[in-house]
């Protein structure tokens, strides 16, 4: 709550100085919710990209951020038909537009560049198509050392090596875990 509160204050200061015609928010982070809420309170039209995505798990902070951002936004860009249906059920269908998934577009745009970059694979002696890529940063998975240790222990038993670009949040907890017996997990800097 403190982080979001600070964002609300900071975003409000910026919006009052800049006076934008429109605020665009993206995804499901705390800043997404803070941006949509602040703009709405200041009567600035707001767009939410990736609207309507739902896990239906209110225990996830991201779910609260998604639902809130959609409620506060004037225009909702939904990536999928299912997201459109969710918005319809929530009474937000009149504000929603099916736009496609910009994450998929970004992936397609960068596949060529990604396939050309083998530096990280070479550094860890990994072969294309013969490793798993792990991203792990959700608080429920990484904030508790025992939970993180259990996850890594299971991943260490996989048939291929695991390439693990380390998120800053995960790094804090990982420092308290003994990684000596986890030869199958290759930690690297964020990509």
Identify the function of each model-found stretch.
Residues 1, 115-191:
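Donor-nucleotide binding loops and adjacent catalytic segments primarily
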Residues 51-55, 101-102, 189-191:
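Short, acidic/turn-prone active-site loops that include or flank metal/cofactor-
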Residues 25, 48, 77-79, 97-99, ...:
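General beta-strand structural signal in soluble alpha/beta enzymes
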Residues 21-22, 72-75, 94-95, 159-162, ...:
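Short active-site oxyanion
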Residues 72-147:
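A nucleotide-sugar donor-handling region in carbohydrate enzymes
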Residues 33-34, 86, 106, 172-174:
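Phosphate- and divalent-cation-binding pockets in alpha/beta enzyme and binding domains
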Residues 1-91:
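Active-site and donor-binding regions of nucleotide-sugar-utilizing enzymes
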Residues 46-52, 100, 133-136, 165:
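Short beta-strands and strand-loop turn motifs
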């Amino acid at each position: 709550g403190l982080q979001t509160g600070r964002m609300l204050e900071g975003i409000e200061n910026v919006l009052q100085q800049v006076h934008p015609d429109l605020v665009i928010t993206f995804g499901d982070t705390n800043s997404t919710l803070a941006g949509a809420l602040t703009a709405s309170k200041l009567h600035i039209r707001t767009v939410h990209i990736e609207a309507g995505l739902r896990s239906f798990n209110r225990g996830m902070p991201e779910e609260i951020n998604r639902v809130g951002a959609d409620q506060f936004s004037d225009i909702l860009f939904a990536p999928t038909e299912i997201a459109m249906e969710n918005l319809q059920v929530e009474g937000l269908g009149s504000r929603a537009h099916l736009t496609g998934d910009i994450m998929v577009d970004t992936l397609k745009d960068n596949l060529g560049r990604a396939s050309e970059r083998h530096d990280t694979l070479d550094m860890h002696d990994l072969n294309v198509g013969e490793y798993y890529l792990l991203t792990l940063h959700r608080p429920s998975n990484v904030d508790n050392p025992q939970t993180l240790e259990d996850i890594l222990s299971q991943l260490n038993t996989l048939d291929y090596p695991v390439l693990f670009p380390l998120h800053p949040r995960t790094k804090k907890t990982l420092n308290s875990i003994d990684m000596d017996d986890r030869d199958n997990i290759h930690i690297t800097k964020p990509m």
